[in-house]
Amino acid sequence: MPQFTAIREESTFVDLQGVTIHRYRWRPGRPKAVVLIAHGLGEHALRYEHVAQRLVQAGYAVWAIDQRGHGATGVTQHGGDLERLGRLGPGGMRAVVGDLVHVLKQIRAEHPGLPVAVLGHSWGSLSTQILLNGYSDLVDAAILSGTAYRMPGSMNPGDLNARHAHLGDTGYEWISRDPAVVAAFAEDPLTFPAKVLPLFGVADGLRLYGVPRRIDPPIPMLIAGGSDDSMAGPKSLRRLGDAYRSRGGLTDVTVTVYPGARHEILNEINRAKVLDDIVAWLDARLLPA
């Protein structure tokens, strides 16, 4: 087991619809920038403890929340009924994005003058794309992990495990080549299948689709994923990068595809390399030369 050294602070806030959101923070002694992590569908923020620890080691403060219907937020929201995890509650996807905006404003207030990046994975990366369409002024850099170009034909709405089902019987073989990661996901009481329509309904499911709007001032963006990601894949990542250049007006867009990696590049067998790449990318763009 990895040895974690940074203390995790846990707190809550109540959002505009009255939902109690659980928030986590990890801080180095003197942070040089801040990263907000937005987790994916069917999981929770504490699956990113190792990511937070690596970023703190590199000098970054890290914030994360258990988003609507997920993790400790979902448990509180649904009165401890784990069968209801994934249901977003009042406000739906708009409230999900609103909660991220609220946290970004908190970060700006607590860390004035420091650069702020968002690291969104999977559903969290789609929420980040939606956020950037309206609140890019709160963000100095964006990392989209396990993401997709949010248009039909570029994002898989079906069974994400279909092409990996022959590799095991958990239903989660699609997330990583690391059997320990797959087993831990299957055994975690706070994880569940990422089935958008049954959980979100049609209206909020459709809100996941869209295209980039112009981002002014432009920010640097890293789009990263695995070549064997069944949610989208390399072609979708490149289309997304092209869209952020042409529609979003961004000039610093990096698209990185990790050969053989599945959906969760941050939990893949090459995760140390992925995290090193992310730290190097952040350092090059957020820190003074």
Model-derived regions, located:
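Alpha/beta-hydrolase-fold enzymes
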Residues: 119-198
